[in-house]
Amino acid sequence: MSIFIGGAWPYANGSLHLGHIASLLPGDILARYYRAKGENVLYVSGSDCNGTPIAIRAKQEGVTAKEIANKYHEEFERCFRNLGFTYDCYTRTDSEHHHETVQNVFLRLLEEGHIYKKTVEQAYCETCTQFLPDRYVEGVCPHCHEEARGDQCDACSAILDPLDLLEKKCKLCGSTPSIQETEHFYFALHTFQEQIKRAVEIAKQTGTWRDNAIQLTERYVKEGLLDRAVSRDLPIGVPIPVEGYEDKKIYVWIEAVTGYYSASKHWAEETGKDDREFWDSEAKTYYVHGKDNIPFHSVIWPAVLLGIGEGAIPRHIVSNEYLTVEKRKLSTSKNWAVWVPDILERYDPDSIRYFLTVNAPENRDTDFSWREFIYSHNSELLGAYGNFVNRTLKFIEKYYGGIMPKGSIDVELKDKIERLYKHVGEAIEQTKFKVALESIFDAVRFANKYFDERQPWKEREDDPVSCEETIYNCVYLIANFANLLEPFLPFSSERIRNTLSIVNRNWEPQHTLPTRIDSVKPLFERIDVKQIERELEKLYGAVK
């Protein structure tokens, strides 16, 4: 089976925060799981280096947009690598390859009659002497009356046009823009109304989209899909490949999401492999992002794919809700966030991955609190999982001189592990990552109980053969926990695999156990709870 996984492209205008990772982490869990199953996986993403936020940041700092994009693209790559993300291709939207692919898609849509020209009114800043693209205009949402950008309201998820906004202001200088006529290209989205309606109906029946994606897309379909501008007067981006319009840029509506397609083509060229199977209607596709990106993946991208004749429209939409910090909404402008480069300096990446999975905003907003983060590490990763691994392997080191005791796998334990693989695998495929991880940790707690009830420290003297059986089965459980947890906690899984000399990495019960165990080290270290206050002081002290 061909599995395509696309992770949303973060804007390269500032550091990643935990909100980004909370929405993107499911992609890596899926990729690791499906590779272990032996499926053909293509997992792609990249940095959005063309977005308006980058141009705005560059202007504010007095540097070029390229300098801003380079800085944060490199930082993103480093952060994703240190968090264990296993992208097959992580690229950027200002690459020559991406520009060429997007222009080809634009021309194909134009040839097929899905794009047309239209004279429209647009916000124009007399002070800055330029037309203002959507994100250069800010104001009040006409629907919910909250603060909004010219393209979308984060408060009510309404898709907007800058002219819809009340109390419009230029983001660059703060002045009120005038309205002037200009010519732009439009995507005939209304012609895909029935196909998008059918797609959301199927998703509702099969449960392959998150509820927020279903509800929001049903709302758009009910209101009637509106044609959307796909060109803008932007300083950076992909030029319109039509004579006389080269100064205009292809707008984010189709440019950014086409990044999945360009990354796929880039991967094919780099590896010499064929990527066509990932765009066939039989491919299983997952798109992983936050709820603010739903319309791009449930409406725009399917319409683009249908317009160019590709069959692999989004089958699974994994659109997480928002992550708050200490019960408050994340705010990058106010510096109310936990920044990824910062947290990675002091904490185990598996601790971050664990917390953001068991507390994932899968169906509702969830909160990151330093207290919960540190206590979850100490009680679950260290106290439950690390404790079971350490007490078992230390027992072998102390009483058997590192030589693996002989034994046979208990039938009940074998059956339990086989059922666990099936249950966890199904949960991952259904994008129920929290359920999957909690199920494994239920088994970890069972394993600790098994160790306590068998009392190998007493069996060693009273019934040495039974003691060997107990420890043998504990190692069997550890080997399989490492395998089951690899999609979630890859770093600690790798440490266990190295300790146990595990070679087989397939998604199946591990029956081959080591003959010797050397250099047993703690799987996790305890975090001093005093660190909670230090982190809170740092967080509150940095607020602007």
UniProtKB/Swiss-Prot annotation:
Residues binding Zn(2+), per UniProt: C141, C144, C153, C156
Highest taxon above the source species: Bacteria
EC number from the UniProt entry: 6.1.1.10
Residues where ATP binds: T332
Main location: cytoplasm
Pfam families from the UniProt entry: Anticodon_1 (PF08264), tRNA-synt_1g (PF09334)
An example Gene Ontology CC term for this record: cytosol
Residue ranges annotated as motif 'KMSKS' region: 329-333
Free-text comment on the cofactor: Binds 1 zinc ion per subunit.
Alphabetized GO MF terms: ATP binding; metal ion binding; methionine-tRNA ligase activity
Compartment(s) where it occurs, according to its Swiss-Prot or TrEMBL record: Cytoplasm
Enzyme class: ligase
Catalysed reaction equations from the record: tRNA(Met) + L-methionine + ATP = L-methionyl-tRNA(Met) + AMP + diphosphate
Cofactor(s) essential for the protein: Zn(2+)
Function: Is required not only for elongation of protein synthesis but also for the initiation of all mRNA translation through initiator tRNA(fMet) aminoacylation.
Protein name: Methionine--tRNA ligase 1
Organism: Bacillus thuringiensis (strain Al Hakam)
The gene coding this protein: metG1
